[in-house]
């Protein structure tokens, strides 16, 4: 009996040691992944370590870090759940309450969000972020109840269950779209430790060509074709897409010059993403080259956007000298030296102490961009700003609902000289999965008119007459 008891105790001791070792190993993996910004991988490792841990203080910290990972990868519903659990476990830093409110706002739960922000204000009254967030929730509620004339439609045939984002017109008549995708079939077959999806490629879709019907009947509406890879579309060896991330495309109006982002792996480590350019010759895209900007290689250079006249390159960077985490910068092209000049910050009217991304310069000189620092509905909202007479950009204006939602909305572009039709990216509720591309349309104004048609001479009403009204643009 004594021998059996000793064996049993030894087995239990071994199991406890093995469990502690496994938990410690997972925790170390999670910490390493978190430091490398591999949030999807870190969250999985934290989950495993959490399930094996018996240390309450350690579990509380891991619960908070799991919430942080979910927030960083845009999984707001999961982040909300983890923040709630962390607060219930009596996490001692009230920042968890602020972040819970942010996740509730991102999910459109504005009343719950306001309660969380009010609770945070009681604990940290000197932090103005909660008060600003309450104001934003009130604005958002009003915007949802009073939508603008824009209508937004999910491009279901273009999107996949993976991330699809950042559409860019690639020819003069706006019948081709380049966009970023993480769908099956991309060049790289590995899963990104940061996002949990495939590494992204640049793919293409175009409006199908339809023969017009004779007569005055309703013409069929052309549809966007099934997206295919860049190499397959142009039928050439793809020199643009690699096994790692490419995306955030910007093209010249003629569609023969392309700027895009590329992530480069060196010695098993990703280096800060840079902007590359390539030109199209004889229908084929040439070997891309990194463009030279005066930005230290330790900092990111992303979301490039070429101005319509090709003299300015707008981009986003976390380099020093800005106002927040990521700012919008611009570089002017110098013809004499055939090079881009030193980056110039877009200033405090545009940039905040948070993040600004996806700049887009319209033909009329309006700058469109996304921000989570200006007052918005939640996540990233799309804003616009017009250049003043002094050359600086003026007060930014929120594009409101339904262009914006409580989720992340960014990457807007417009076709033609107006701002009536275009595309944007959003991970809003109701999409196919992750980021989706949406079509944007400005609805026509509708008027209700009534009156009586009378004879000029007699003043008597005229019966049985149909009236046709024609506008200055020929519309009737």
Put a short name on every predicted segment.
Residues 49, 85-86, 119-120:
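Canonical positions in the second alpha-helix
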Residues 54-57, 91, 125:
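Short coil turns that delineate tetratricopeptide repeat
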Residues 59-62, 96, 130:
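TPR alpha-solenoid repeat register
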Residues 76, 99, 106-452, 456-475:
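Short, conserved micro-motifs composed of acidic
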């Amino acid at each position: 009996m004594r021998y059996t008891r000793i064996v049993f105790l030894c087995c239990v001791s071994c199991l406890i040691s093995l469990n502690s070792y496994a938990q410690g190993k997972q925790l170390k993996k999670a910490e390493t992944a978190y430091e490398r910004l591999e949030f999807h991988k870190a969250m999985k490792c934290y989950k495993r370590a959490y399930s094996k841990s018996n240390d309450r203080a350690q579990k509380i910290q891991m619960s908070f870090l799991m919430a942080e990972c979910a927030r960083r990868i845009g999984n707001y519903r999961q982040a909300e759940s983890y923040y709630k659990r962390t607060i219930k476990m009596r996490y001692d830093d009230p920042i968890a309450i602020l972040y819970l409110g942010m996740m509730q706002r991102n999910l459109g739960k504005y009343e719950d969000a306001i309660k969380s922000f009010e609770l945070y204000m009681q604990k940290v009254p000197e932090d103005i972020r909660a008060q600003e967030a309450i104001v934003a929730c009130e604005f958002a509620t009003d915007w949802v109840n009073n939508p603008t004339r824009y209508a937004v439609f999910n491009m279901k045939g273009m999107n996949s269950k993976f991330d699809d984002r950042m559409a860019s017109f690639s020819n003069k008549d706006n019948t081709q779209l380049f966009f970023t995708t993480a769908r099956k079939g991309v060049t790289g077959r590995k899963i990104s430790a940061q996002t949990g999806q495939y590494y992204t490629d640049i793919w293409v879709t175009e409006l199908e060509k339809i023969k017009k019907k004779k007569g005055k009947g309703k013409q069929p509406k052309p549809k966007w074709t099934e997206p295919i890879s860049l190499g397959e579309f142009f039928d050439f060896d793809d020199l643009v897409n690699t096994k790692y991330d490419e995306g955030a495309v910007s093209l010249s109006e003629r569609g023969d010059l392309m700027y895009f982002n590329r992530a480069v792996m060196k010695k098993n480590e990703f280096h800060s993403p840079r902007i590359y350019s390539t030109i199209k010759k004889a229908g084929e895209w040439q070997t891309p080259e990194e463009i030279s900007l005066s930005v230290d290689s330790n900092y990111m250079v992303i979301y490039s956007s070429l101005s319509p006249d090709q003299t300015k390159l707008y981009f986003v960077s976390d380099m020093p000298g800005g106002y927040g985490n990521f700012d919008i910068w611009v570089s002017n092209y110098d013809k004499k030296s055939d090079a881009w000049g030193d980056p110039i910050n877009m200033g405090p009217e545009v940039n905040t102490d948070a993040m600004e991304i996806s700049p887009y310069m319209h033909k009329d000189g309006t700058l469109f961009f996304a921000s989570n620092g200006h007052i918005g509905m939640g996540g990233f909202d799309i804003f616009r700003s017009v250049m003043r007479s002094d050359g600086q950009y003026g007060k930014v204006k929120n594009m409101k609902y339904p262009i914006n939602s409580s989720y992340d909305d960014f990457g807007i572009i417009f076709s033609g000289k107006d701002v009536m039709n275009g595309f944007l990216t959003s991970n809003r509720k109701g999409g196919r999965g992750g980021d989706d591309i949406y079509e944007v349309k400005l609805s026509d104004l509708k008027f209700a008119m009534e009156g009586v048609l009378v004879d000029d001479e007699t003043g008597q009403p005229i019966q049985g007459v149909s009236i046709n009204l024609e506008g200055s643009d020929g519309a009737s």
